[in-house]
Amino acid sequence: MDPKGQRVKLNDGHFIPVLGFGTFAPREVPKSEALEVTKFAIEAGFRHIDSAHLYQNEEQVGQAIRSKIADGTVKREDIFYTSKLWSTSLRPELVRPALEKSLNNLQLDYVDLYIIHFPVALKPGETLFPTDENGKPIFDSVDLCRTWEALEKCKDAGLTKSIGVSNFNHKQLEKILNKPGLKYKPVCNQVECHPYFNQSKLLDFCKSHDIVLVAYGALGSQRLKEWVNPNLPFLLEDPVLSAIAKKHRQTPALVALRYQIQRGVVVLAKSYNKKRIKENIQVFDFELTPEDMKAIDGLNSNMRYNELLLGVGHPEYPFVEEY
């Protein structure tokens, strides 16, 4: 942690802000909103912005970042921007063109972090979710170690400062860590993580290898029908979280975010609501007690909101492992 406790050091020497702004929004949300809310998030104090080629909003998010640099709110080096390599570009020869496409959409010279979004390779092409005539995903077969080597080259070329992964299980991480001739370790593994699914085993594994765990879905997910089982309970209505929030005069969302930061997890707060964006930055204004942390640990039931079922049946589908 740096003095203000708001950034952690990655294993390659760069620093990542512990609180990030997630820019993903459902399809029906107009893309122009990504521009507005990202500008607002930067004004509110967010310095870590998380997006991806899959979100189809990098043009707007890049525009927001550039406008806040142009008006003097921030310098480029104040912003930590993450993009992600989508599953249709996991073949090694497609990695750099995919990153260059993101940079072109963003109109930025580099990203701070480039990560493999999901270890399941899909058929290359413009279609994000290629399917056959029966609506089944069309998989591709790619050695993730070769994909990783292509990411290492992107780092060497200065297109990204750091490289990492997302939605990997510990065996997939091990495969990269044990790869002969490994040049750079993944700096992070971005996974679903919240009090109902606290990823304690994966977190311990990552910490033991100096890999930062980044939490998405930290507030329990946006519950999009195509991704999330609608019968699952709402995290933010949990009585234990509510009681702890009341005690600290905070919201359950802030308690859920604070919980991650105190465990050494980098946490993404995803909201397109300006009041809540402003509220989420207040996560640094209070501290949970060891008793609070223990009570929240007790909520874990290994309940995954985002099963990413499109990858089921692929040999690299990550969620068949316990962690």
UniProtKB/Swiss-Prot annotation:
Positions bound to NADP(+): 20-24, 50, 166-167, 190, 216-221, 270-280
One of the Pfam families matching this protein, by short name: Aldo_ket_red
One GO CC annotation: cytosol
Keywords: Cytoplasm, NADP, Oxidoreductase
InterPro entries for the chain: AKR (IPR020471), AKR1C (IPR044482), Aldo/ket_reductase_CS (IPR018170), NADP_OxRdtase_dom (IPR023210), NADP_OxRdtase_dom_sf (IPR036812)
Binding site for substrate: H117
Active site: Y55
Source organism superkingdom: Eukaryota
Site residues (Lowers pKa of active site Tyr), renumbered to this chain: K84
PROSITE patterns the record matches: ALDOKETO_REDUCTASE_1, ALDOKETO_REDUCTASE_2, ALDOKETO_REDUCTASE_3
Any GO MF annotation of the entry: bile acid binding
Any one biological process term the GO annotation gives: prostaglandin metabolic process
Record's subcellular location: Cytoplasm
PANTHER family referenced in this protein's UniProt entry, alphabetically: ALDO/KETO REDUCTASE (PTHR11732)
Family: Belongs to the aldo/keto reductase family.
Protein name: Dihydrodiol dehydrogenase 3
Organism: Bos taurus (Bovine)
Organism phylogeny: Eukaryota, Metazoa, Chordata, Craniata, Vertebrata
